[in-house]
Amino acid sequence: MIKTFKFILLFLTGGNLYYLIEILWRGHSHFSMFILGGICFILIGLTNEYFSFEMPLWKQQLISTVIITFMELIAGIILNIWLGLNIWDYSNLKCNLLGQITLQYSILWFFLSLPAIILDDYLRYWLFDEEKPHYRCL
């Protein structure tokens, strides 16, 4: 029961933050971005289940960037291409793939993943008695 509550809380936190970032960046968002944000936040947090805190932060950020970019690509293919919802279209940006992901946003996700990693770690520590976070920079 506690594990279910933990994942619901982390999902809601990530979903709300992702949705808010979209509102601040683009001026609008779509409900699917709430869902995508929640899933990404949980996946970012699960990296500590497979890799230790001894992994340098920049590597955690790199893994998180790959997760977010991959999830954005999958969501874009399903929502924008298959279902035709046209929630976003990066076709006019350089280094895009199918108009769904682009290098410049992947770089942005690298930097935005740092506060997400730290927030997830501390939420798990404060609320669920998980290991106290500690980090290596290099």
Model segments located where?
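Aromatic-rich, lipid-facing transmembrane alpha helices and their immediate juxtamembrane interface loops
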Residues: 1-138
